[in-house]
Amino acid sequence: MFVASPVKTNFNGVSLVKSPAFSALSCRKQHRVPISRQVRAVISREEKAVDQEDGKKSTNKPLINSSQFPWQRSKYTGSKTVTAVVKIRKKIKEKLTERFEHQLELFMKAIGQGMLIQLVSEEIDPETGKGRKSLESPVMGLPKAVKDPRYLVFTADFTVPINFGKPGAILVTNLLSTEICLSEIIIEDSTDTILFPANTWIHSKNDNPQARIIFRSQPCLPSETPDGIKELREKDLVSVRGDGKGERKPHERIYDYDVYNDLGDPRKTERVRPVLGVPETPYPRRCRTGRPLVSKDPPCESRGKEKEEFYVPRDEVFEEIKRDTFRAGRFKALFHNLVPSIAAALSNLDIPFTCFSDIDNLYKSNIVLGHTEPKDTGLGGFIGGFMNGILNVTETLLKYDTPAVIKWDRFAWLRDNEFGRQALAGVNPVNIELLKELPIRSNLDPALYGPQESVLTEEIIAREVEHYGTTIEKALEEKRLFLVDYHDILLPFVEKINSIKEDPRKTYASRTIFFYSKNGALRPLAIELSLPPTAESENKFVYTHGHDATTHWIWKLAKAHVCSNDAGVHQLVNHWLRTHASMEPYIIATNRQLSTMHPVYKLLHPHMRYTLEINARARKSLINGGGIIESCFTPGKYAMELSSAAYKSMWRFDMEGLPADLVRRGMAEEDSSAECGVRLVIDDYPYAADGLLIWKAIKDLVESYVKHFYSDSKSITSDLELQAWWDEIKNKGHYDKKDEPWWPKLNTTQDLSQILTNMIWIASGQHAAINFGQYPFGGYVPNRPTLLRKLIPQETDPDYEMFMRNPQYSFLGSLPTQLQATKVMAVQETLSTHSPDEEYLIELREVQRHWFQDEQVVKYFNKFSEELVKIEKTINERNKDKKLKNRTGAGMPPYELLLPTSPHGVTGRGIPNSISI
C-alpha cells in the first residue's frame, strides 16, 4: 500500500519535498504505465502542519487503491525505500505555442505521464541471471523550487527488497512526444547517495522505444564492471555505433565514420570537389550522416537544403546559449557585409581599397558608404540614402572592433620587427623552424618543379648577416638563423591557383629566412618567392629589405605575399586539419568504444564538447565548395586539396604534442634536466614558453589520473574497451595513415598518458593558441591579407609604371577587395569569440566533480586548476618583463593567447576545454 511519509532531500543548495500531485489518471491504458504500490506519495511537513491546523487527521490511505492493479503486488517481504531526484534542464522557449507545450509537459509529468525510470542493481538476480530491476516508476509531482531557473526537479520513490543491492544503472523512458534534456539523477536511501550524471537528451518513445541507460558516476574499467550491469554496459555501446545504413535522424546519437564526400556538388561544374579520404587525397574521417548520394562515381553525398543543418549526434549539438551566440555572430556578419555588397551591386564590381582610410573606416560607424554612395537621384541614390538612414540604428552591427595589432600602434604592422615577432607570438607561431644548413633543399620532383636548391644562397645570406656584425658560419653555429618554408606545400598548387578565373588571386610559394639578434628581435633577412618553372626561367625571385623607395615598397609586397601564404597554411593545415579534423575521429571512437563508465571516457568528455557540431557547420559553409575559405583565402577551390596534401606529407600523431613538435622544428632540444624534457632555442618564444607550462600541467594531471586507474602494463593491455578504442582511431578514424610505423603502441601507462596528453593539448591549448588570435591579428587586412590579387610587378610588366607612380595604390590594389575583406573579417571575428557558456580548462574541477565520487580524483583536478592559476600569474609577469622583446614594448599587445581564463567575447585570451568554435 502507499505510505505517506516525509522525505527531505538537499543537493546543490536545493531543498526538495515530494508532492502527492497525481491521481488514478496517471495510469493510461495506451501507455500501460505501471503505477506500483511501491511508489510512495510523500507529503511535506508544511502540508502536514496545514492539515493539523485545519483540525484534519492525517491518514495513510492510498491515493490509488493498489488492489485495482493485482499485477503490481510486491513479492518482497523485506523492503526499503529509495528516492530518485530527477533534474531536467529546460529549453529556452520563446514562442507562445512552445510555452503552451511547456505547460502541458509539466501537467503530464505531474500525473506520471512524462518519464518512467527503472533502477538496475549491480547485483545479479538469481532468477533471471541479469541485474536485479525495480519496477518502473513514473517521475511525478509538480517541479520543485530551485535557485537556477534553467532546471526543473522532480522525484520518484521506489520500494525495493533489502537485498536489492546498490543501483548501478537507471533505465529512462521518455513518454512525451518531445525530447527531454536530463541533467542528472540522484538516488538516495537511508544509507547512501548515488549520483547518476547524464547531461543528455532523452529521445521520445515515439522515435525510439528503447529506454536510455544512465550509469552511476563512479568510473570503472570493463573488468571491474559489477555483474549486474555488464550486459547494459555493452548494450549501451552497441546502441551508439549504428549499422552504417540509412540517413541519420536528428534525435539519434549514432557515431560512425565517413569520408569527406560532401564538400562539393558534382551536379554543378564549378562546385565539383574531390572526395577526401581516398588514396589520392587522404584525410581523417568525419562523422557519418547517411544523406543520399547525388553521384556514384565518385560517391558524393547530398548537401541537403541550404538552411538544413548537417546531422551530428544529438548530444553534440550546440546548447541554446551557444547556438544564439553563433547566430548573433552570423547576423552581425550579415550587416558587416551588407554595405559593401550593396556597393558592389550598384557599381557592378567589387571595390578595392584605394587608400588606408578605407580600411580605417571599417572600425567606424559609417563604413564604406562614405566612399561608395552614388550621387544620382535614382535607385542608386535612394538605396544609398536609405543605408545612411539606417546607419544610426545599426551602428554597433556595422562597426568592427579595432584589432589588437593596431589598437595602440597603427603602424606596427609595417615594421620588420613586428613581422618577425608574429612568427613567434602571432596567430600562427607553429611553422617557424631552426635553419640548420645551407643551401635549403626542396623534396619536390625536380623534373616538375625545377632545381631542388633554393636561390637563397649563402652569398645572399652572408651579405645580410654582415649588417649584424656576424658571419653565416657563426650565425648557424649560434642558432640565430630561422626559416618559415611554404615552398613544397604550395608550389604544386601555384599554377592552378593563379589560373582561377572567378575571384582571381595570385600567389607564389614562399620561403623566409629570419635572423635572431642579440637584443632579442627576430628580423626577416630575405624572402624567396617561387612560381612554377618554365623553359626560359626557374621563376624564383629573391627580395631583401630595401634602402630606397622602390625596394622598400617591393619588400612590403613580398612580405604581404608571405603573410598570404601563412594565412592559408594556418587556416587549412594548422587550424582546420591539425585540430578540428584530426580531433573528430578521436571523439567518434571515444563514444563508440568507451563506455560512459570508463575512466578514459570521463577524462576526455569535457574536451569533446561542441567539436562535431562546429565541424559540421564548417563543412556546410566554411570549407565547402564556394564557401568562405575558398572565396577569401589564397588556395581558392584547391583549399581542401592542399589540406589533404599536408595530411599526407606531414601529419603524424606522435609529433602533435608540443615538446615533440618543437624538437622536430629545431625550436627546442631534448634536455632531461628541463621541466618538460626540452630546452627552447629561443627563450623569448611566447607560444612555446607559455605552451610548455600548459602542456606540463596537462601531462601531470593525466599521469596521476592514469596511474590511479591502471596499476601496471597488464591492466592496460587487458582493457578490451581501451584497446578497441585505440585500434579504431588508427584503423578507422585515420584509415589513410593506418600502416604508418610511427603510431604509438598502447602497452603501458606511459603510452596511455602520452596519447591522452596529446589529445587534450590539441583540443585545449593548441587550438586556443591558433584560433582566438584570428581577429586580433587578421582583423587588420594589411597586416595579414588572406589573399593577394596581383603578383609583384617586374620592370617589364605593364603594371610596373603604375607601381612606380603610385606604390600605395598598387599595394592596396593587391589586397582583398572590400567585400572579400569584410567577409573574412566577419568570420574571423566570429571564430575568435568566446561564447557565454564557454567551459575553460581551469574550470575542469567543476566539470569533473560532477562526474566523480572519488576524493583522490577530485584532488587531482583541484591541483590542476590551482596550477593553472599559477600559470596565469606567471604569464602576466612575463608580459611585463621588459627584457622579453616579443611580449612587451611601446604599443605592443602582450601575448595572452594561452592565458587560461577569459570573459566572453573577442578577447585574444582564454583556453576552453574543447574545440568549440
From Swiss-Prot:
Record SMART domains: LH2 (SM00308)
Gene Ontology molecular functions: linoleate 13S-lipoxygenase activity; metal ion binding
CDD domains for this protein: PLAT_LH2
Primary location class: plastid
Annotated catalysed reactions: (9Z,12Z)-octadecadienoate + O2 = (13S)-hydroperoxy-(9Z,11E)-octadecadienoate; (9Z,12Z,15Z)-octadecatrienoate + O2 = (13S)-hydroperoxy-(9Z,11E,15Z)-octadecatrienoate
GO annotations of cellular component type: chloroplast; plasma membrane
Pathway stated in the Swiss-Prot or TrEMBL entry: Lipid metabolism; oxylipin biosynthesis
Limits of the Lipoxygenase domain: 219-917
Assigned EC number: 1.13.11.12
Keyword Oxidoreductase: yes
Co-factor binding comment: Binds 1 Fe cation per subunit.
The entry's keywords: Chloroplast, Dioxygenase, Fatty acid biosynthesis, Fatty acid metabolism, Iron, Lipid biosynthesis, Lipid metabolism, Metal-binding, Oxidoreductase, Oxylipin biosynthesis, Plastid, Transit peptide
Transit peptide: 1-40
Binding-site residues for Fe cation, renumbered to this chain: 575, 580, 767, 771, 917
Cofactor(s) of this protein: Fe cation
Composition bias type Basic and acidic residues, residue spans: 46-57
Compartments where located: Plastid, Chloroplast
Domain PLAT: 98-216
Family: Belongs to the lipoxygenase family.
Chain's role: Plant lipoxygenases may be involved in a number of diverse aspects of plant physiology including growth and development, pest resistance, and senescence or responses to wounding. Catalyzes the hydroperoxidation of lipids containing a cis,cis-1,4-pentadiene structure. 13S-lipoxygenase that can use linolenic acid as substrates.
Annotated protein name in UniProt: Lipoxygenase 6, chloroplastic
Organism encoding this protein: Arabidopsis thaliana (Mouse-ear cress)
